[in-house]
Amino acid sequence: MVSPKDLVAIVHSSLLGTSRPTPTQRIELTHAIRNSFPSLQNLLSFPPPKPSDRAQVQSKEIRLPDSLPISLDDQDIAISLKLSDELHLNEIDSVRLLVSSNQEWGLMGRDPLEIQRLATGLWYTGRRDLTSTLYTLLRAVVLDEGLEPDLIADIQGLLEELIEAGLRQRLITLIKELNREDPTGLGGPLCERYLIDSRGALVERRAVVQRERLILGHCLVLSILVDRPGSKDVKDIYYILKDNAAQLTEGNDTISSQITFSLLFSLIITFVSDAISRLSDKSSMISQDASFRTDFQDIVMASGSDPTADGFIGGIRLAWAVHLMLIHDGISGMDTISTASTTDMGHICSCLESIFSKNVFQFLLDNVLRTAAYQNDEEDIIYIYNAYLHKLASCFLSHPIARDKVKESKDMAMSVLNSYRTSDPLDGSMQTEESDRPLPFISLMEFKEPELLSGNDVLWTFVNFAGEDHTNFKTLVAFLEMLCTLASTQEGASKVYELLRGTSFRSIGWPTLFDCIRIYDEKFKQSLQTAGAMMPEFLEGDAKALVAYLNVLQKVVENGNPTERKNWFPDIEPFFKLLGYENIPPYLKGALRKTIAAFVNVFPEMRDSIWAFLEQYDLPVVVGSQVGKSDQSSQVYDMQFELNEVEARREQYPSTISFLNLINALIAGEKDVNDRGRRAYSDPCEKWQLVVACLQHFHMILSMYDIQEEDLDGFTEHPHFLVSLETSSLQTQLPIIELLKDFMSGKALYRNLMGILQVGVNSIISERLSKTYGKILEKAVQLSLEILLLVFEKDLLVSDVWRPLYQPLDIILSQDHNQIIALLEYVRYDSLPQIQRSSIKIMNILRCSRLVGLVPMLIKIDAANSLIEDYAACLEGRLEEGEVVENSCDDLGVLIMQLLVDNINRPAPSITHLLLKFDLDAPVEGTVLQPKFHYSCLKVILEMLEKLPNPDINFLLFEFGFQLLCELNLDPLTSGPTMDLLSSKKYQFFLQHLDTIGVATLPKRSGSQALRISSLHQRAWLLKLLAIALHTGSGSSSAHLEACQSILSHLFGREVTEAANEPFSSSTYPQDGLDYAGTSSISKSKALALLEILQFRSPDASMQLPQIVSSLKYDSLVEDILGNRDTSVSGSIYYYSERGDRLIDLSSFSNKLWQKLHSGFPLVDSFPNVAELSEVRETIQQLLKWGWKYNRNLEEQAAQLHMLAGWSQIVEVSACRRISSLDNRSEILYRILDASLSASASPDCSLKMAFVLTQVALTCIAKLRDDRFSFQGALSSDTVTCLDVMMVKHLSTGACHSVLFKLVMAILRHESSESLRRRQYALLLSYFQYCQHMIALDVPTSVVQFLLLNEQDGEDLDIQKIDKEQADLARANFFIIKKEAQGILDLVIKDASQGSEFGKTISLYVLEALVCIDHERYFLSQLQSRGFIRSCLGSISNISYQDGTHLLESQQRACTLEAELALLLRISHKYGKSGGQVLFSMGALEHIASCRAISFKGNMRRVDMKLQSDVGYNVQKQRTIITAVLRLVFALTSLVETSEFFEGRNKIVRDVVEFIKGHQSLFDQLLREDFTQADDLLMEQIILAVGILSKVWPFEENDGYGFVQGLFDMMSKLFIASPIKSILSQGSELKLSQLRFSLTSYLYFLVTKNSLRLQVSDDSLDSSTKLRQPTLLLLASLLSHVTDSLERAAEKKSLLLHKIRDINELSRQDVDAIIKICDSQEYVTPSDNIHKRRYIAMVEMCQIVGNRDQLITLLLQLAEHVLNIILIHLQDRSVSSNERGSYGSKSHIQQEVTDLCGKLSPTIDRLALLNEGKVGHNLKVFQRLATTVKEMAIQKCV
């Protein structure tokens, strides 16, 4: 069985939605009704208490169906039994109710009484859901609301089944039983009187039960319209009506009255509809039962002792009489039933006699139709009541018997009463009410539903009958009042006008009205002209008749045909003539002014003439005449005298009210506004009418008139001057100034207005429902609040000028906190949304800096809790509405949500903290939110976002709800509590909204663009909310971690795996990478589906004006208006929406257009001709349509970007922080990358969207690049294989091709910008970097070969195959680029030449990357042919025209220079000799040499960046540029090696030498640097400088620069072993070996080419030589050191390779030791398993092995150089001869040679013992050389 809560939700969504129910909803509805058939049939019938069940509860354990046993404690038992006793509920059901209450509210920590009240409230909520469901079903059948006929037929069939099964009898029984003072009804005397409803409010149980009875009464009424009742039901309803009517005398209870009305109208509808169905030959239930007619006649004619009950019985008699009349006509036509006909006639006559004698019509007017209870009932029910009253009256008036009775009553009245022109107050007691018995009843009844008058010939026939021969004013007035009602429609107004214009009636017509006015005007004029004459008396009869005439005329004018009514009353001056006479009755003046006001509203063109007539006849003298003025001789209207002396005596104020209303009507129509306060009341309605009229006047003054600067020119801050202004004539002050001064000083008007509001919202609600003036009082409250808002808008404009006598309104309010509370509590007033709206706006104003400490004040005076519940109830009530609010600024829900959002960041405690029930007694950030425990806006919002009720209506509330939660999660104070709350399982329904909202079909723009816009924003905030959860979710919280895993699973559609506490992917990757570029069985993830939602062409939001405007002469005027986009400027036509979009204010736009257009034509509406005016109107209409469309399109464009921003956030956060927990994450990243590129290349993608999409693609490619080298071992094994270490996750070739192709298309998109292309270039560079390596960068090739040889499954791995695949990928990349090369090069070269410095830099790097992938010298030729290389060199050279140090102040320009050098260097490296030749031929060395950016003076070492950030950055950047220049020069020196020369120098050598000479200081300083203290950059510069010198300086004959000695000095430092240990400790052994290699290369060149011969030792050096050359002993020392290094490197390499091979056999301790030795502890956490540890250790060891292998290679080459140099010297015979004296004596030389050979011999022996297996190189040639040297050394020693 469907629960009541689900049932009512299904019924409401299906039948009360804005759109028709879908087929699924219809099936669900029918199924739910069928399943709930027993509950509806036995409505509110529940199992009673049972002793056995009570015993089971007392046993402290019960078992509910489909649940585990429930244990109860003593408190649970006590509450359950009390619920059973007080609700007459079964004990088991009481326990079930308690369990449900705990699930709904959370009962932990609550006291027993509160728990009981909550459970009782839940109980009655379920009952209400059932009754509401029944009411909705009945209403859908009875009222035509556009539902499908077959659906209505199905529901009607089900309802008829229910009624036949006894539903109506159950309704009647319930209405009776629920009125009893016992547990089954209102509750016994010992029962708890209060309960807590679904909104958390404490309400009286009696009120809830009475409301339940009322709904049942309404259901009873509707059930009669579905299926007519039988005689038993009629009698039962009659007796209940009689009992209820008798109880009405006990008090004025609105709901009790409405229940009685439902019973009354149930019988009226029954009698009327049954009789009518008899006449139409339809089935009739009671009209065919003659015995029932006799019995019921006796029952209904029995008189009672209670007058109220007898009055309601009189109404039943009226309906019964009409019933008998109708069936009498049918019976009379049948000859066989003449006796029954005669009997019924007697019954009719007796009923009519009773009806007229007891004046039932007047009773129905006073006690039913005019009561507040009737007027405040449900609108649909009132409509049904009025419709059947109309049928009742029509049937009554159409019958001859009734008409005869009316005529008899009328004749009797006219024979008793005097003529309507006579009036004697003394005869009032003798004048009965016989005159107007049926007419006022008919008038009011017809006024209720005027549309029912259309085509009612019966009524018009009665009008002609009733309008004849009126001889007294009372019958005339009654008749005219009926005509006034009949004129409420256009058809009726025309008929009434014609009726009174013609000769239908002898003494009634329009001429009578005007003749009477003329006669009295002449009498009064004659009296004024006669000295000492008294003003004649205005007869009461004439006055009241005139009032009735004027009311008819007013209705005729207001509702007449617009075309015809212009000619009906051309002269309106007579209506003004009587206004100036003091003896005119005030009510007559009121009627005259109301009539005039009608003309103002209907005919605006008459406004000027009406003002003129008012000035002539009716303008009052409000204050005394000014000094110096003489008394006026003419009659003047003294409003104060009339108000205080005339109307106050009568306690009636029609004249004053009408005057104010007339003035208000005139003011409301003003367009040019630059030239411009205890009484007794006989009728309380009139009191509040007067108040409303005054308030409307003040409201219009404050809203229509603005304060200009010149209005404040006369004010000064001097207090005395302000006082003098107060004493000045009021006539010299603007009305708005007077009003503001009153409010800002808390004077009379302010006090009176606050007196209205401080009555309190509860009292206003009570009077609204129980008093006839309730609606007028409600209007007064509404106006009062709106006036306060208007004052708030203006007070700050004048407060600075008027201080200190006048203060802003908030200061005045804060003098009494009760005033503030009174204003804020009106949010509780749910009868009129405008009042709630004003209260919320006042709260929004006060919460700002207007009133500091608002929340503490509310807490202090104990008003906070009620306000929290009131706001929650207001928001919940808004959610339950079934209508769309057109203007979101007036939407109560939107206002509350904006209030909450805007106050999140306010200092704590803020209004948001209060209304969302954060803990304000402790730090807000420590709150534990419990929305189930507390009724607040948070509870309502979370339930709203969970269920998403009425999405077509509440879409804005959903949007702001998601936004609120996002903002709460971002705020430092509220993020913790909110995230903890949303991470709980109850609120993980947000994930489901990825389906219900996220990937749902986007609403069509043509259907509802507002819904479409909001739908995009909803998705954006939802994605942002989930992104925040992923970003901030704490790993220490299992709830947070589970929430994050669920989000990822829903978003990407993958299962999440976990190892220990760290999540890892469980997949392994094959050698060939992931093949998901082609077909795949994997379904599309929600992330991709969300992106597809976004891919639509953005609507045009440009400022291009419509064609009709641009082709006319108004285009410049419109552009001028639209040009000023500053919203802060007064009169701006732009405003910021609640979402922050800057939109056009269409109202301001229209006003500004008219103002500008009228400036050319000063007179309003005075255009040169009609055609010009028509053209202007058409233009403005077109502009307003364009403005509306512009606003919508701009909002949709912003919404699309907003959703894209939300999508990008959740994708990027997932990729960066959480995606490691997903399987196949590389596949996910690829798919997002591919989809992002596809979307950005689409022609529908805007520039802003492409920017965001490119950023997402950048993130994905970066994560793919990083993810290639992450640990990918299988979780199920502890072993590590070579596959784990060697292979990287790599996209397949097809996938890479797809990415590159789409990226190229995105770069070449039609709409682009440099900023977008910069990101696309960065993406292209990242892609090329990604494609470079398929084997892990940390694993050298030599190690890979070793792993392949030792891996058991090594045959499955083929390095050559992998290399081939990589080559194929690179070649394919080239051809894809080449296909679109022209377009790409056009863009890149343009950006590199003309773009910003940022654009130039990255464009140059793109060109470098293109050169990198060039396979056919294609890009080189393109760059040459386009002249870009030469341009690039020129750019470098042009720096010489500036100061180099000044250049470096432009840091980005330095980056551009670095990029230019990198491009040239890439050309040289990529194309080898040909590339170098191209550069050289273009004068690259000359251009580089002229670049002053490398003209550096100072220390080349690293600058302390902390001390001088700017200078330090510039120096560091210059060091980088110098390094780049040296790299390029070194690359060009490769041409020297391949050039043909003999001993002379060619051009290449000359140019390089000239470069060196030009930068002598640079090279000199580098040679003198202490390399033992150099950083990596400086060390590279030293190596490059030595390398350059070693290549070209041997050809320089003149060593005047000292470079040779510098190189020799460096050799002497590096070739000895003393500093080696300290250097090795710094990890720079490889760099030092490179430097030694360059030096030995230089020395080898000198020895071989220049025939340089070295001395054996320093002792043999000639002291006369200038150069301190290295010696052979120094080289022998170097060779010994190199041998040591070779042995250490080979041994370490061998050891590590063996450890790598045995890694799976090592224990965890051994593995950890390796990790520690490798200094890689940061990559390991204590929770990592042995598999990951082995992987990390293995990768680190592979890297070290690679470094050792590189060092070994370099050392072998270095040793080979040294051996060759020594060999050359040993082979030279001069070493052993005595021919050259410079070598010393023979014995000394021989000794040196012997020492040299002795030092070489052990070193060479060690070199000969090097193991090729350990070294990893072929040593045959090397060892042969070493053997040769050893042999030669031995020979020399012999």
UniProtKB/Swiss-Prot annotation:
Pfam families: Nup192. GO terms for biological process: circadian regulation of gene expression; induced systemic resistance; mRNA transport; protein transport; response to bacterium; systemic acquired resistance, salicylic acid mediated signaling pathway. GO terms for cellular component: nuclear envelope; nuclear pore. This is Nuclear pore complex protein NUP205. InterPro entries: Nup186/Nup192/Nup205. Its main location: nucleus. The gene is NUP205. Keywords: mRNA transport, Nuclear pore complex, Nucleus, Protein transport, Translocation, Transport. Belongs to the NUP186/NUP192/NUP205 family. The keyword Transmembrane does not apply. It is found in: Nucleus envelope; Nucleus, Nuclear pore complex. Part of the nuclear pore complex (NPC). The NPC has an eight-fold symmetrical structure comprising a central transport channel and two rings, the cytoplasmic and nuclear rings, to which eight filaments are attached. The cytoplasmic filaments have loose ends, while the nuclear filaments are joined in a distal ring, forming a nuclear basket. NPCs are highly dynamic in configuration and composition, and can be devided in 3 subcomplexes, the NUP62 subcomplex, the NUP107-160 subcomplex and the NUP93 subcomplex, containing approximately 30 different nucleoporin proteins. It comes from the Eukaryota. Transmembrane segments: none annotated. PANTHER family: NUCLEAR PORE COMPLEX PROTEIN NUP205.
